[in-house]
């Protein structure tokens, strides 16, 4: 079954996201704290005619880290080279990328926490002093070659900032914590998307979609497309609050933005473990999901919305979880 509330990009969504991507900070909706800081740092770097300090963007998937990287490059008026941690398998791959940079370029590395340690270590001198030392040849004939690099800005994006080594994390002069979006910001994003794709939607429908999109623009845009389909087949094409509710109910997205996987997690905790505490590994086995998937994709939203608490002995379902799913609590 397709999980419509998965915050990772699926299929042609990356193409759609590029179409919707704002170009400048003034067009970027939400994340005001990060934007306000970046605006000052970017203007100061341009005033001094220097490259911007290296930037680390971290937070849950689907919140616009990649979009923000492109916006930063546009604000600086420079080129952006894009890659990802898993794509850089060995040091030579990174050396080739670094050697291709022009002065002032932005190098964007998505999922930077997934780079091998040997590759990561190449970045240390590159980030701090704009040079790398590479080994040429093998055995007794090998020699070290010093390679100067032009000043550049590295933007790293990660969903798991805690997995970055201390030496790498310390080399980022700017950090931006991307947080779940407020409903009013998501409503504005949904209305903007609808306008770009010439969809007819009421404000009430956009607000309802925002409320059930887990604070995540990627999910909001995905659900909007499915609600549009429902409106075209089951209605007259207008996306109103009634059509929206029926479509999202069909997709198993409830009024709190929880889908069948979220509810399965909560029901398992309540029915099998009396609400907890239960270890993450045990819970993952019971719902047939990878531990990392539960920790990265499902748990953050459930914690943020107050359905789950983390304790020293494990995860615990809250009173709100019991009430939301219609369970009576007998352990109090």
Swiss-Prot record:
A GO term from the CC aspect: Holliday junction resolvase complex
Record's catalysed reaction(s): ATP + H2O = ADP + phosphate + H(+)
Major place of residence: cytoplasm
Binding site for DNA: 291, 310, 312, 315
Protein name per its UniProtKB record: Holliday junction branch migration complex subunit RuvB
Class in the EC hierarchy, top level: hydrolase
Family recorded in the similarity comment: Belongs to the RuvB family.
